[in-house]
Amino acid sequence: MGLLSKFMSALIGEPYTPKPVSQSAPKPVQQQTTQRRATAAQPRQTQQTRQLAQPAQSPQLAQSQYRAQTQTTAHCTSSTTNRSRSTTNRSRAQYRSNSQSTQKLMLQPMLPAEQIERVRNIIGKIEKHELSDEQISAIAGAGHNTLVLAGAGTGKTTTIVGYITWLLSTGTATPEEILVLSFTKASADEMSSRITQSTGKVIRACTFHSLGLEICRSSTIDNRPIIDGHTSNNVVRNAFEYLLEHNVSYRLLAFKLMSQQLLDKYSAAAQLENFQLPTDDYAFNQYRQNLIDAAQTIIQHMRSNNIDTAGMQTLNERYGGKNIGRNREMLQLIEPLYHAYVQNFATNNGIDFPGMIVDAISCVNNGSYRHPYKYVLIDEYQDMSRPRYELIRALRLQHDFSLFCVGDDWQSIYRFAGSDLHLILDFDRIWRAWGPTRMFQITTTRRFRQSLIDASGAFVMRDTNLYVKHLHNPSDKKDYSLKALGGHTEEERFNVIVEQLRKLPKTASVLLLGRYRSDINLMIRCNQNGLFSIDQSTGNIRFLEKPDMDIRFMTAHASKGLQRDFVFLLCCSGGLKGFPSTIPEEPLLGLLLPEVERCPHAEERRLFYVAMTRCKKKLFFIVDQTRPSRFMYELHNKICPNIFRGVKLPPQCPNCGEALSLRHNRSDPNRSFYGCTGFPSCRYTQQAK
């Protein structure tokens, strides 16, 4: 293993004993706003949170305060340990919205008709289409800090291209003074291409990590190697496997964290030095992989938030709550893996992907990088994370620029990757120190029909913390575009899918959506007659009766930004891996992520909304009639009951929202009762009539 083997030899030259974790922790411009309809959550506060909660102040004061706070970390390539140590004291990982009631921006009115027409004449058509009045108003009415809330299918990218065209056409900025930031390379490349085709100019459009890499390399050594995620994950995996095989105390701790059953089963044998790992035990292999995945994810978030194991101990002691003990054990397991990870890129003077933005912030703070931008545009702003926010903030403190952000709070679905919804909900509070903040909405969509717009909007807006938006389709077709299809068994649900596919046009484009990748198993297990050719690796599915039909399976997360004629939502069931998913979060990881929202299943609701809005013509809910999703009950009872004709739902548990199932009394077979399908988490029962 080369470097890794040398490092691990030094690390475990003697029997490894987890170190005990310490039991104690070391000691902008006024804008019109409107109160949120419901009281915001009361999250825990940190120094960073309190700073954001302060009243608006001048950019000069904000700049001096921020530089004073970050002075200890103003370096780019020096000791990772020192950087992490200073960061620990500031708890950078713990961004939480402030405990005061969040105030939301007032929607700006549209510009007068004559002004809109003048602006439209200057901009012209964008990608062969005229911009809407809402888009023109957002472009010409933009302030120093602008948030454009653009719903699904309303033309977010077109608005960004139009704004750049406006800046160039009016001579407000040159191409070199404009930066466009996106979250994926594919979207950044598409943005760059569309801007060039529309304006004839080359505008810098890149991801946050690409910008971070550019900053790091321009500030230090051009050829610093990138330590890719595959290599980093292998370092963590190899270190874990080595310790698991060669260290008794580490092995016992790992078994305990995997499962109490595994610990009971192997605890005696695991204390032997020549213990052989039970690799033929399915449960062991499954738990081991889950533990490795959790460790890799936690370490990546530690790096992206610039916090080390000592900082994690501090966070756990302050905010671990009932999970403090379990988190301590997880930290003991992760500590040597984290050191192996850090040593791997530090020895090679490399740049790891999770730490790329952290290093870039240091380069900006110490002045080794100077940016040339007057206008920065951010696409998909709802996906902003705390490290990305801090990079933008550091750039503005160095040399201010106008900020133009386009996003949709209804489609914020990446908390597990660090995205923080409060960065869009608290836009005014966060950015008003730099100047006036303004908000516009774009609500006209032609992607899907009004019936789906109304149902999906009513569904997502049951979370009252989100901005109110009223999307509409000007074509206003009256045909209903939602339908629930049910089945009590997998075979029944498979058959209703086949029946509907036979009714669709032979060249239709179709998405089969799941909450998890494993949801494709419905199609695989029931495909006994060979009706489909299924490629699990790509998700491509060929319906042999209609070979020209374009069918693809993917998860709801992966479908964001896509659209197809017809969508089948396969996972309308309850349970741990249902929709909403109720799989508990790793508590140690939760310390590194934004605060969980008070609205139950808030992000799962937004993810369900994203899944609903992928179709252009018709959406089919494939309902498990033995254990329907609680979202199905919500649609059935409160939003669109008419789509459930022919699909009867079982009674719903009033305690937890899961389905009730009819059961027979063991002592008296003639007596029956309803029990919650969420048992043992929910023990609700009621007598059957």
Task: Give the positions of each predicted feature.
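Conserved RecA-like helicase ATPase core segment
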Residues: 386-479
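Short cysteine-rich clusters marking metal-coordination/redox-active sites
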Residues: 653-656, 676
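Conserved helicase C-terminal RecA-like lobe
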Residues: 505-509, 550, 554-613, 617-622
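Conserved RecA-like ASCE P-loop NTPase motor core of nucleic-acid helicases/translocases
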Residues: 173-185, 203, 406, 440-444, ...
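Accessory N-terminal region flanking or inserted into the helicase ATPase core
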Residues: 98, 103-154, 158-159, 177-179, ...
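Short metal-binding segments enriched for Cys and/or His
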Residues: 678-689
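P-loop NTPase Walker
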Residues: 3-4, 8, 83-85, 90-233, ...
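Inter-lobe coupling/hinge region of RecA-like P-loop helicase motors
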Residues: 124-132, 136-152, 224-225, 436-446, ...
